[in-house]
A protein has these predicted regions:
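Conserved active-site-proximal phosphate/metal-binding subdomains
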Residues: 13, 21-67, 73-211
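Short amphipathic alpha-helices and their capping/turn segments at secondary-structure boundaries
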Residues: 1-16
């Protein structure tokens, strides 16, 4: 990506987010890779990316921070990412279970009642695998196509007549509270979340000795 942008536009990145296989939502890995996550040398990939971006930092005389994402749960994970040479981390799932998150209470409750056993990899209508909570909706779309009554034009090449379901409607329904009849994306460590807290307390827990 850096090479392409440098060649075509003489521009480089402001920062790089490296998302690993434990992330929630759509994943940049194949189903086969995700079935053998332990075999993915994610640490090695991070180190290679950090080494690669140095060339472009020198060429453009700017710092390009590397942010690690996907499955970052606690201070131990943050410290590990920083030890690899990353400049920071990106965390999503843990902030869903906060009072400040604008998702419905039912959506947050689905997170804190999740277990490792009911988190699975699904095939999204966009053609990528994704990680989500198993619910009635997931069970239904495994059995049959759900008719699409309205197109939100969110994907250029989406055909409402052919897709198994409308992912936009499924995501909106879930976040608004219909968690059994919508799509609840989540990270691999969501089963470790057991309470709804505040952003302030969560930041204190995550930063702690790192400050």
């Amino acid at each position: 990506i850096l090479k392409m942008w440098a060649h075509r536009y003489d521009r480089t990145a402001d920062f790089i987010v490296v998302e690993g296989p434990k992330a929630g939502g759509h994943l940049g890995f194949s189903n086969e890779q995700l079935a053998h996550m332990d075999a993915i040398n994610f640490d090695g990939e991070i180190r290679q990316i950090i080494d690669c971006k140095k060339e472009y930092e020198q060429r453009y005389q700017k710092n390009i921070p590397v942010i690690v994402a996907g499955g970052i749960f606690d201070q131990k994970d943050i410290s590990h990412a920083l030890d690899l040479g990353a400049d920071g981390v990106q965390i999503a799932s843990r902030f869903v279970a906060t009072e400040e998150c604008d998702a419905s209470e039912a959506y947050k409750e689905a997170y804190i009642h999740a277990s490792e056993e009911n988190i699975e990899i699904i095939q999204s209508p966009v053609g990528m695998p994704g990680r989500a909570l198993r619910n009635k909706f997931i069970d239904r779309v495994k059995r049959a196509k759900l008719p699409v009554s309205k197109c939100y034009n969110c994907l250029e090449k989406c055909s409402p007549q052919k897709v198994p379901y409308c992912i936009t409607k499924a995501l909106i329904d879930a976040v608004r509270g219909d968690v059994e009849n919508g799509l609840v994306f989540c990270g691999a460590n969501t089963g470790r979340i057991h309470e709804i807290t505040t952003v302030h307390h969560l930041m204190q827990e995550l930063a702690g000795d790192l400050q």
